[in-house]
């Protein structure tokens, strides 16, 4: 619309100035100049001067309009960029004129309102989820405390310290998992918050083997552990690595039908092998366990290799 007005205004201005000057000359100055034609009189150059002055004034007005239009476009551009960034939601823009730019500003304001609503809704959902996780953590820890007390009294009456030690370790592990509820989301591993720390592989795997040794012996599986000659330290997260290896121990116990499992630390890498029947990666139960292993390794920046066939399954874990 602005471009059309600018194009049509120049000839219209020339026509208006020429007609006005001609009328003024004919009515006031032509009798004084003895009927001299307009184009030969002094009024003609005066008309040119008036036209040029009017043209400059018109150009100034259009430049102001274009500057105002560019200012609105830049304001819209900055607002949309702020809306797309991780910063706070921008304030709505004031609509000053009911033109095309005004309609566009109304649309952007509607988008800002929608984004603000969604942000508040997500924040409220996040608070509700945190509250539910805290309640769940409390509800889990309450029976765990009672279970510890009951085991304490049973320990004096029964023999078999290995059984009680394994149960205590499992209870402590569940308790540590509940303490992590405030560090990561319950929905995806990608949204988890990981604190890297020094993890001593010899100690971690020795603890894991002791924890699972009783259950493996009850299932007729020999569990052998060969630590490294020297301490091997990875920058990772102890609890998440426990979850990683516990998942492997659990899957082997449930599905492998193995007679022997070996856990070895060699050249800074972790090797876990069994002599079971292997598994099909596309099968739902094993596939879910493998997905957990893949996601956890990606989360901890651990490289792993998997080999499985009818003669058993082998895992290789390494970290740069």
Curated annotation (Swiss-Prot):
**Which residue range or ranges hold the HAMP domain?**
67-120
The reply to whether Nucleotide-binding figures as a keyword in the UniProt entry is yes
The Histidine kinase domain sits at 135-320
The question of whether Phosphoprotein is a record keyword is answered with yes
Which GO terms of the cellular component aspect does the record hold? plasma membrane
Q: How does it sit in the membrane?
A: Multi-pass membrane protein
Question: Mind telling me which residue stretches traverse the membrane in this protein?
Answer: 1-21, 42-62
Q: Which CDD domains match?
A: HAMP (cd06225), HisKA (cd00082)
State the compartments where it is located. Answer: Cell membrane
Query: Cytoplasmic side of the membrane: what ranges?
Result: 63-320
**Free-text function comment from the UniProt entry:** Member of the two-component regulatory system YbdK/YbdJ. Probably activates YbdJ by phosphorylation.
Could you identify this protein by its name?
Sensor histidine kinase YbdK
